[in-house]
Amino acid sequence: MSDKAVLSCRNLGKSYEEGPESVVVLSGLQLELHPGERVAIVGTSGSGKSTLLNLLGGLDTPSEGSVWLAGEELSALGEKARGLLRNRALGFVYQFHHLLPEFTALENVCMPLLIGRTAIPEARQRATALLERVGLGHRLAHKPSELSGGERQRVAIARALINQPGLVMLDEPTGNLDHHTAQGIQDLMRELSTSSRTAFLIVTHDMSLARQMDRILRLEGGRLVEA
């Protein structure tokens, strides 16, 4: 693996047993993602895009091959160490926001910092600044049930960015957003890829979003190909 890559996988594969049959979902995948790079993965429904994100993010175990995140081979780490690495080096935005319903927007964004033992005043200050950056400075005290779908997604994106990770993975990040808000998220990603050298890996059906990335990869037949 290149020591400059924030994410790398080699010969990555995933299969499932269905009775006597082995169903191959992904096979022989190769990928390197470098600081500041923005890559989109596109493909039809059921092609394995979400499975791939889960493997790359250490949320699932591959059947073959290896994944390296921030210089660490995920399969060589225990569950606790893997969780700490994800919290430090990776931000993840799901298609559905997965915000904690009992906490406010500010508290949700603070959570990764508090897990990493950042002092509460500093965590609140940094989370407030980031929520203001995504246009939600006036919604800090609102719980997810009091926010629109687009607002909840922006809170989730802020939460993914709060630790200033080297890599952010996003699963259909603009699917619930109007055009203006979606463009704002795209602009923020572009800015961070330049100013902070944050890398972004995005799974999307939105080709207008994919075309704004540096590279587009298509997942078909269980393999990644340049689109």
From Swiss-Prot:
One of its GO terms (cellular component) is plasma membrane. It is a peripheral membrane protein. Keywords: ATP-binding, Cell inner membrane, Cell membrane, Membrane, Nucleotide-binding, Translocase, Transport. GO terms for molecular function: ATP binding; ATP hydrolysis activity; transmembrane transporter activity. Its EC number is 7.6.2.-. It comes from the Bacteria. The keyword Phosphoprotein does not apply. ATP binds at G43, T44, S45, G46, S47, G48, K49, S50. GO terms for biological process: lipoprotein localization to outer membrane; protein localization to outer membrane. Residues 7-227 form the ABC transporter domain. SMART domains: AAA. It is an enzyme of class 7 (translocase). The complex is composed of two ATP-binding proteins (LolD) and two transmembrane proteins (LolC and LolE). PANTHER family: IMPORT ATP-BINDING PROTEIN, LIPOPROTEIN-RELEASING SYSTEM ATP-BINDING PROTEIN LOLD. Part of the ABC transporter complex LolCDE involved in the translocation of mature outer membrane-directed lipoproteins, from the inner membrane to the periplasmic chaperone, LolA. Responsible for the formation of the LolA-lipoprotein complex in an ATP-dependent manner. Belongs to the ABC transporter superfamily. Lipoprotein translocase (TC 3.A.1.125) family. This is Lipoprotein-releasing system ATP-binding protein LolD. It comes from Pseudomonas syringae pv. tomato (strain ATCC BAA-871 / DC3000). The lineage of its organism: Bacteria, Pseudomonadati, Pseudomonadota, Gammaproteobacteria, Pseudomonadales.
